[in-house]
Regions:
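Extracytosolic ligand-binding ectodomains
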Residues: 2-4, 10, 26-418
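Sec/Tat signal peptide C-region and signal peptidase I cleavage site
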Residues: 20-26
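Bacterial N-terminal signal peptides
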Residues: 9-19
């Protein structure tokens, strides 16, 4: 080991003396363990999630934090489970960043707390952290910072849209997945808070070959609207089965329905038969961040996997990873204690407003305080690592997702705090 280190040092010195850039040693990398899906109920998201992560890291690596390029290790959780995948990334791959603790975090929380306490790593930014209880995160002992509001907020937004659409009652259903359950419970609570009639709320199995019995059960209740929280495949199947049964419903789905698997499963003809098929998801801000982001994403080699860069997951990946990288530069080291404080510093306060990674990294290196506002809008965090968001209503039109409305974010936050 000593001989290898001396040889490496000599090679670097020789390269410098000859005027060449010194090669980056593997130990200088920042390794990002990406908890993603390649198999299972959400397996269709895999190429998209991986492509988005690679696209964002390519932007950051044009001028990486602390001069240390960031490299992703994409780890499927669909088959082995989130807990086992997380342990593999931390113990075997030695990642410094664990990206996307999510639905099953509580099953390995003790392991992560012990690891962070012992090593001061990994950092835990999470696009899917909205499925984690809102009292968890935002501390050096548990450095979870979310890229989106809590999942419950999307459930609240979906129900508010039903009311704004002029409907008088609703049936609310969800698959037995943690995030879907949280959204359903929030929608039911919202209905109670605003005095909206819920004709029924019930759970369904994920991954069924068809949902004809569910369609029949809903039909007997004769609702004016149906709200469903599920995977793209399950949602698409229900939409198609309902159309096959001759139903024409006002359907509001969850953000997962942004994946093309939903559109392909539901089919264009079935969607057209319904009164409406829309979904509630986070939308982008109208600020200087958006167009440069779109231009970069569309020009990247991963655009074929990403599809529409305005997808809420894509913009959340972008802002979260950019903010995380800026915080690493601000901290001056890779450690949960300094990074946690830096996450608050670079996303809030009275610092110089910046709208891109380039602006932020340059300002930090000039010794300035910054306040990063990204594609999703303000990135200011609560003391448990929760970020706010903008809420849009979307529908599939000729194979492409289009925003057709919005939901009052202040009203969502008001109901969420009750």
């Amino acid at each position: 080991m000593k001989r290898s280190s001396v040889a490496s040092a000599g090679a670097i010195a020789l390269a410098a003396s000859l005027g060449f850039a010194a090669p980056v040693a593997a130990e200088d990398e920042i390794v990002v363990g990406h908890l993603t899906y390649h198999t299972g109920e959400f397996g269709a998201f895999g190429p998209f999630f991986d492509g988005v992560a690679e696209m964002v890291l390519s932007k950051i690596n044009e001028d990486p934090p602390l001069g240390r390029p960031m490299r992703a290790v994409h780890q499927d959780i669909g088959t082995v489970g989130e807990a086992r995948a997380a342990r593999k990334l931390v113990d075997s791959d030695g990642v410094q960043i664990l990206l996307n603790p999510a639905h099953s975090y509580l099953s390995y929380r003790e392991f992560m707390l012990e690891t962070v306490a012992d090593k001061g790593l990994p950092l835990m930014p999470s696009v899917h952290g909205g499925a984690i209880e809102g009292t968890i995160g935002g501390t050096s002992a548990e450095p979870i910072f979310r890229g989106s509001p809590l999942d419950t907020a999307n459930g609240t937004a979906a129900l508010l849209h039903v009311q704004e659409a002029g409907k008088k009652n609703v049936v609310i259903i969800a698959t037995e997945v943690a995030g879907s359950q949280l959204q359903k419970e929030a929608a039911v609570r919202t209905a109670e808070a605003i005095g909206f009639e819920v004709l029924g709320d019930f759970d369904i199995q994920a991954g069924e070959s068809n949902y004809r019995s569910v369609v029949a059960r809903i039909s007997r209740l004769n609702p004016e609207a149906v709200v469903m929280f599920s995977s793209p495949q399950a949602g698409g199947s229900l939409v198609k089965n309902a159309a096959e049964a001759g139903e024409s419903w006002y359907i509001v789905g969850s953000g997962e329905w942004q994946e093309t698997e939903f559109y392909d499963t539901a089919t264009e003809s079935a969607i057209a038969q319904h009164e409406a098929v829309v979904l509630a998801a986070n939308s982008h801000a109208d600020n200087p961040s958006f167009q440069p982001y779109m231009d970069f994403a569309n020009a990247s080699k991963w655009i074929g996997d990403i599809g529409d860069p305005a997808n809420s997951y894509a913009i959340q990946y972008y802002d979260l990873l950019v903010a995380s990288a800026l915080a690493i530069e601000k901290a001056g080291e890779l450690n949960t204690a300094s990074w946690t404080q830096a996450m608050y510093d670079v996303t809030g306060g009275e610092g110089e407003k910046v709208y891109s990674y380039e602006e932020g990294i340059a300002a930090i290196r000039d010794g300035k305080d910054i306040n990063y506002d990204g594609v999703t809008g303000t990135m200011e965090y609560t003391d448990t690592g929760i970020v706010s968001g903008l809420f849009g209503i979307f529908e599939w039109q000729d194979g492409a997702l289009a925003q057709v409305g919005s939901v009052d974010g202040d009203k969502v936050l008001e109901l969420e705090s009750m």
